[in-house]
Amino acid sequence: MNILQTNNMKNEQTYRFGKEEELFHQTILHANNTPAYGLFDGEMGITLVLSDYVRARKRRPIKTAINVLLDNILSNLHKNMPLDFANGLTGIGWGVEYLIQKGFQKGVGVEMCEAIDAKLMEVNLRRVHDLSLETGIEGWLHYIMAHVQGAKLQRREAFEKGFLAECMDVCHQILLEGKADKALLSLSNKMIHILKGEDTPYSFHLGQFIQ
């Protein structure tokens, strides 16, 4: 490889990273204009992706912007927001736990998600027929597991015992019927082990929710 080829490669790499930087700065600038705050298609999803980017590229100015985004999300939560995992409260709560447990953000999960938990515990899980990830039981289980794990790590307790017992009953019923998809069956089994106090870690996989 000659010097000219090497210089061309360096120029291409500089241009590529420049475009990448430009893209992420534009994302930050327009994030507050996003009409939704949720995980799949809103500000929380943007915040998590940017957080991973900050860690990979070590960009402190962007980290400050991420803190502003998270503050904006949490300050705009209200009781009329849906509990949906895709674009509602439980997805936002999952995002909060992601940021704390991955070391992106300081804070106490049970305090930051107190309003989310209160609304979720109003639901009679046994009467919920929607098993989907986006708007139903599967998504809620992701949040509940992440939240219970986060609380345990911080020596706190998430949710009332009666609610967790109800959650376990629902998971047992899902496994007993065996009609759910493989993802929900696996999730229900893991939920039962976690609620029994067994050492079964919940793993965060952002890529399965945000493409």
Spans of model-derived segments:
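Glycan-recognition and catalytic cores of secretory/periplasmic carbohydrate-active enzymes
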Residues: 2-211
